[in-house]
Amino acid sequence: MLPTYERFSDPKSVLFRLPFARLALVALSLPLGGFFFCVIWSLTFDFVRSTYTHCDVTNYLPSVSAAIGNYEPQKTVWRLAIFLHLPLRLAVAKIYLEHYREHIRRSRRLLGILACFLNVVEDLALFCLSFWTSADHYETHRNAFVVFIACSECYMLVSYLLNRNIQKTVLLPHEEKSLRYKRNLFLVNVIAFGLAGYCFVRHNSHCEAGVYTFFALFEYIVVLTNMGFHMTSYWDFYALNVVCDAKHGLYLSQS
């Protein structure tokens, strides 16, 4: 059974209709493109400044915060990407909430609400840490980052559990594929986050050459696996359309 809602609206009342795959690709391509632009631009044109460390040891990669938030035009490009993709991410969170209400067991629907809450808070925290940078607003940026990471890790775990064992129906092949990617991306994300934390502490304690480079590399993996996890919505809602009409609001439909 495809994850779709049995709602049929008057075609004349439909405000828009588009394939969910297109929505998912746009929602991912904005931050993904912005991230790669910021890193590549920093390495090409701001290498010395973006890779500088407080103890001036050898470093070859900018941290995520340095790449996206410290210099222009990277700061503006990243903020624009996050600003434009936020409504799409919130729309996807709303679609997931409706999906969980429709397709998971009634006794577990609080988990669906929790997943939606974590997803929304993660999105808002990402917005905050992008617009309040570490260079200009360190405490706000730090707190937003902590909230982002906590909600991100919890959301990935809850989302995986929701899709693994509390569905009402047997999973279809594309849903099983999504589940495998969720599991693998979550595990890589957690491992990379742990290694990034280790490298950060070691760098601050010993100031060894190259350690901050590994910290930045593991940061990149955390960012990319987070984006990849959210991209699994492509398979969760395979071959469906996102429809918005005046009566039902935003929902999924096969028609």
UniProtKB/Swiss-Prot annotation:
Pfam families named among the record's database cross-references: Frag1
Chief site of localization: Golgi
Entry's localization field: Golgi apparatus membrane; Endoplasmic reticulum membrane
InterPro entries: Frag1/DRAM/Sfk1, PGAP2
Sorted UniProt keywords: Endoplasmic reticulum, Golgi apparatus, GPI-anchor biosynthesis, Membrane, Transmembrane, Transmembrane helix
An annotated GO cellular component: Golgi membrane
TM region(s), chain numbering: 23-43, 111-131, 143-163, 185-205, 209-229
A single BP term in Gene Ontology: GPI anchor biosynthetic process
Source organism superkingdom: Eukaryota
This protein's record includes keyword Transmembrane helix: yes
Membrane topology: Multi-pass membrane protein
Family: Belongs to the PGAP2 family.
Function (record text): Involved in the lipid remodeling steps of GPI-anchor maturation. Required for stable expression of GPI-anchored proteins at the cell surface.
Name recorded for this polypeptide: Post-GPI attachment to proteins factor 2
Gene, per the UniProt record: PGAP2
